[in-house]
Amino acid sequence: MKLWDILATCLLLLSSVSTRPLFHKLQPSKRAVVRSESPALDPIIDSQPETSNPKQASMEEQYDLTGLYPEQFEDVMDFIEATLGRLRRSSDVEPQMKRDRVRQKAAANTEKSGGRGRGERKRSRGRARSRDDRVKGQGRGCLLKEIHLNVTDLDLGYRTKEELIFRYCSGPCHDAETNYDKILNNLTHNKKLDKDTPSRTCCRPIAFDDDISFLDDSLEYHTLKKHSAKKCACV
């Protein structure tokens, strides 16, 4: 569309130049010749109406104008050729710019896809490590487990339909036993110690969940403290 707009502008300039009156460019010498020759005409001819003189003058002026057109045509043609040259150069540059933009977009998309791929691989490796940790943790002994219960199931004397997640510690602590624990266990097994000897190392909570409050069937509020384990260890 840009090329056609410029060509239409050039054609309008050309048509305006071809139809524009150029009386102000007439050569004064030719006008002087016409005036100097007019008194020498025959009286009979002078007696004729002067209506034919304007026609003759207009024909002469038109004849003179045709001599001036080539210069203006050359100017217009030079302008058109220069405009077409610029359009050719711009048409050669625009495809190259488009190709460069396409390459840049392709490179950006490749980098984005590569970044997403690396992120997904990192996340998959992280999930695999977490699964391995869970599998290994199952064999480490003392673990934190959970169960969904009703508050009434806790047998603390509350009658309510409120529910909670109860977390507890479970598992052996053989790996956490010290020589003291082993000696104590051996002496107890050989009945060389009294029955009131402290128990062995066991899996117990070392941190508890936040307190919870609930409304029982009698519309009374109650609060449970240190009711659920948050972190476990062999103690």
UniProtKB/Swiss-Prot annotation:
Disulfide cysteine pairs (residue numbers): 142-203, 169-232, 173-234
Glycan-modified residues: 150, 186
GO biological process per UniProt: branching involved in ureteric bud morphogenesis; diencephalon development; enteric nervous system development; glial cell-derived neurotrophic factor receptor signaling pathway; metanephros development; mRNA stabilization; negative regulation of neuron apoptotic process; neural crest cell migration
Main localization of the protein described in the UniProt heading: secreted
Compartments it resides in: Secreted
GO MF: glial cell-derived neurotrophic factor receptor binding; growth factor activity; MAP kinase kinase kinase activity; protein homodimerization activity; receptor tyrosine kinase binding
Tissues/organs with expression: First expressed at 14 hours post-fertilization (hpf) in the ventral half of anterior somites and in intermediate mesoderm. Ventral somitic expression persists and extends more posteriorly over the next 12 hours. Expressed throughout the ventral trunk mesoderm and endoderm at 24 hpf. By 30 hpf, somitic expression ceases and by 36 hpf, expression becomes restricted to the endodermal cells forming the gut, with expression along the whole length of the developing gut tube at 72 hpf.
PROSITE patterns recorded: TGF_BETA_2
Record key words, sorted: Cleavage on pair of basic residues, Disulfide bond, Glycoprotein, Growth factor, Secreted, Signal
Gene3D superfamilies tied to this protein: Cystine-knot cytokines (2.10.90.10)
Cellular component annotations (GO), alphabetically ordered: extracellular region; extracellular space
Residue span(s) of the pro-peptide: 20-87
Signal peptide: 1-19
SUPFAM superfamilies, per database record: Cystine-knot cytokines
Region Disordered, residue ranges: 34-60, 91-137
Compositionally biased spans, kind Basic residues: 119-128
Subunit structure: Homodimer; disulfide-linked. Interacts with GFRA1 coreceptor and RET: forms a 2:2:2 ternary complex composed of GDNF ligand, GFRA1 and RET receptor.
Family named by the database record: Belongs to the TGF-beta family. GDNF subfamily.
Protein task: Neurotrophic factor that enhances survival and morphological differentiation of dopaminergic neurons and increases their high-affinity dopamine uptake. Acts by binding to its coreceptor, GFRA1, leading to autophosphorylation and activation of the RET receptor.
PANTHER family for this protein: GDNF SUBFAMILY OF TGF-BETA FAMILY, GLIAL CELL LINE-DERIVED NEUROTROPHIC FACTOR
Name under which the protein is recorded: Glial cell line-derived neurotrophic factor
Native source organism of the sequence: Danio rerio
